[in-house]
């Protein structure tokens, strides 16, 4: 990159994944977060803009603090990349912060931690107000058992049992630093903090935890499932509705703001 001409910017954005067919641009022109964002950025930059994201999300998966970087020759003030871009974005996406960063900053490769929350409604009837906002099960769940199982995720492990068949990660070995499971007002929250995640990993974990909570899988069975390192014996992938990317960790020197998780979530 010619640093004399180009600037590198990092932006933090939030989006409603139910409105888009995932993050990545697609050849058939269906609405995606990346396509909408790059179109809006181009309006402000006056030139084509290509973005690099911290972590791609699937159809239906949300983000409260996704991080993206892009290069541009356009000299614009910081607010142009926030308010200006937001004026050109469709409903369901908003830029929260923008910051000019060092030319070597990389949204994906410089990230050393990622945070996800899965919001699950446990109720006999699914609330129409939570559709697309939370996963749902009609089953009564034993939160204590689920919490014990979730604790087994912490540490560096081979998570092949929770890996999608189409996952392109070079290694299934990842490190989970924190796995907290709580419940309030009929909503279960699974918070995971790890160095990186496999494709569908969080949704597959939630699917297995629901099996534990409903008595279809014991805590010991959950532990054995991890050790099996095979997707073949694992419970089905859970729905995307309740999955949120809630933060990305970067070295402090880059000054990337990680917003707090919204209180409503």
From Swiss-Prot:
Protein name per its UniProtKB record: tRNA pseudouridine synthase A
EC code: 5.4.99.12
One BP annotation, GO: tRNA pseudouridine synthesis
EC class of the enzyme, as a word: isomerase
UniProt keyword list: Isomerase, tRNA processing
NCBIfam families: hisT_truA
Pfam families the record matches: PseudoU_synth_1
